[in-house]
């Protein structure tokens, strides 16, 4: 089980979704059961990816549920989101309703492959932000914006980035659900990135601030051909 105090999520998406949005929500600590990660298709796919064994346990968990949600969007709604809403009923509302519509109408999506450039990019940004004790942002402490970082790591075509901040024991699955809900985010940019059929590659990094709070970065890219 896990306890969640605060989640802050931000998004910056190139090509399709331009601009920034952010939302901060504070929750009373509540215990939530952690579902088993036992989908063989997702596990086999993930474990075959180059760079997978370099991920931390939290990063592997986040990667699992991201790909599970793309392979089984309807099941993700029923088996993951709904049980969470029972614990946090304050999450009910228009965003939950639209998420249900989106997850039940979307067809099965391609599972994300790990990309070395995106892994390095996500890890570098998460590390730079936390080591500098900087506020969660898509702009690095040295002033580099997402577009610059994307290009500097040898990536091209379209791409995007989701970031999330969690205080206390920030659970990867909870952070993902909050990104999907996109409460107070008018353009639903996080959700659109996660369900974007053009995005086929990802890189994930979760780093800790000195106070133990977590900063998550997930970068995306289209085909690099």
Positions of predicted regions on the chain:
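Acidic/histidine-rich, surface-exposed loop or edge segments in extracytoplasmic proteins
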Residues: 39-52, 99-107, 157-161
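Bacterial Sec-dependent N-terminal signal peptides
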Residues: 1-24
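A well-ordered secondary-structure block
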Residues: 124-223
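Calcium-binding acidic motifs and repeat modules
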Residues: 51, 223-224
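N-terminal low-complexity, Pro/Thr/Ser-rich intrinsically disordered segments
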Residues: 24-60
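Short, well-ordered surface patches within globular domains
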Residues: 52-153, 197
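Helix-centric, low-specificity signal for extended rod-like, repetitive segments
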Residues: 13, 63-64, 184
